[in-house]
Design a protein with these regions (language model features):
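Interfacial/gating helices of multi-pass transporter permease domains
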Residues: 18, 52-57, 132-133, 175-182, ...
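Short membrane-interface helical motifs at transmembrane helix boundaries
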Residues: 32-63, 119-121, 269-292, 296
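Interhelical loop/hinge segments that connect adjacent transmembrane helices in multipass membrane
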Residues: 123-125, 139, 148-193, 380-394
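Transmembrane helical elements of multi-pass membrane transporters/channels
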Residues: 64, 75, 142-146, 150, ...
Length: 394
């Protein structure tokens, strides 16, 4: 966000200074997470209530995931910095490529070698047969390849942010203080939301293997519906941030409403499509009839929440672009911990997985209403906009 402000103000030198500080801090932070993750990787599956037959595979997966955290963190940081410079297309293309690489690596690492017949010709498909461990390694390798590409385009090819001779890494107290004020609420929010996801898993785990599998596949299928919202939210962050940096405070609220309305419209359409083709979406992911039936039911429940989910996603991006992160983080915390989790814990023993997703649907609608109310009636995010305006960037 600070990079977008600097570029909007025409201060490319300041943008590069913040970029280098941000990459250094992100790397150090990811190393801390790596240490914590590897330390708890063996016992975490048991804490979450996993059955003994899956705990060993879960340990292997989470261990590889933890070891890959620095790569993932630098990948995310580089992509966000490219987006903040106004280059939305390249990170999106690279993330799509990462998905294809993930599938390709998984195909070779998860399954053993086998023969297939294609047009009367027998082909040998090599494979290592590593199972769950192969899935983790495939994802980590895909992240590594794309991280290298992201860093190359950021540090060598970006018109505004590529490295220049004579510009060394140095930490500025003012930059770090502003970064802490903006990022700490977001970091705490992500930590709390991750904890909430763990608690959700804990609520689903006792419902049995079919419910666990249906829940996992449904989350994967639903991501096709809400990913456009996150893309629009990222674009909104850049637009608002550069408007702030340029001193165009008159544009911030108008762009905020345009982006939020557009996101809601897109996800309303994708939600309607998801409702219609839910059985087919789950069928692609699982051959099990029971998983297909349960997964389709919960996807259709969630489809009704997609427009309001979009409101919270995009409006959050708008607020972040203006430097307003504390109140949105509090709204996310309250809706997740005070609405979704208690309601899911109450409904799960009575309605099973359907109850968990009903709780999710209700919570997302409430969250969307809260974000729309803040966008409409609160002026404090406009004040946050002015606090990070051009006078502070000189």
């Amino acid at each position: 966000m600070q990079i977008a402000h600097r570029i909007g103000a025409g201060d490319d030198v300041g943008a590069r200074r913040i970029m280098k500080q941000g990459l250094a801090v992100a790397l150090l932070y990811s190393l801390v997470l790596l240490s914590i993750g590897t330390g708890i990787s063996r016992t975490l599956p048991e804490w979450l209530g996993g059955e003994s037959r899956i705990c060993q595979d879960a340990f292997h997966y989470f261990l590889i995931y933890s070891l890959a955290l620095p790569v993932m963190q630098m990948n995310l940081a580089a992509g966000a910095m490219l987006q903040s410079s106004g280059n939305m297309r390249l990170p999106s293309i690279l993330h799509v490529l990462m998905c294809f690489l993930d599938m390709l690596f998984n195909m070779f690492l998860i399954f053993p070698g086998h023969n297939i017949r294609l047009a009367g010709i027998t082909l040998l498909i090599p494979g290592m047969g590593l199972g769950v461990l192969g899935a983790a390694l495939g994802t980590a390798l895909a992240q590594l390849v794309i991280m290298i590409c992201m860093m190359y385009f950021l540090l060598a090819r970006s018109p505004a942010l590529h490295l220049r001779k004579g510009e060394k890494l140095c930490f500025h107290r003012k930059d770090l203080k502003r970064a802490v004020c903006i990022s700490v609420p977001v970091a705490v929010e992500q930590f709390i939301m991750s904890g909430a996801q763990i608690m959700s898993t804990r609520i689903v785990a006792p419902l049995g293997m079919i419910a666990i599998a249906a829940n996992s596949f449904s989350i994967t299928a639903e991501s096709l519906c809400y990913m456009p919202g996150y893309g629009i939210g990222s674009a909104a962050t850049t637009l608002i941030g550069q408007s702030v940096g340029a001193g165009r405070h008159d544009l911030t609220k108008r762009l905020g409403w345009i982006a939020t309305g557009f996101g809601m419209a897109v996800m309303a359409v994708s939600g309607a499509v998801m409702y219609l083709i839910a059985p087919w979406m789950i069928a692609v992911l699982s051959p099990d009839v029971a998983i297909r039936a349960l997964g389709a039911q919960v996807l259709r429940i969630e489809a009704f929440a997609e427009p309001m989910y979009a409101a919270s996603i995009v409006a959050s991006g708008v607020f972040r672009g203006a430097g307003d992160t504390l109140i949105p983080s509090c709204l996310n915390f309250c809706s997740m911990w005070l609405v979704r989790l208690p309601l899911a814990a109450f409904l799960a023993p009575r309605l099973g997985l359907r109850g968990v997703w009903i709780a999710m649907c209700i919570e997302l609608c409430i969250r969307g209403v809260l974000f729309l109310m803040r966008l409409a009636f609160s002026k404090s995010w406009d004040k946050a906009d002015k606090r990070h305006g051009t006078k502070q960037l000189t």
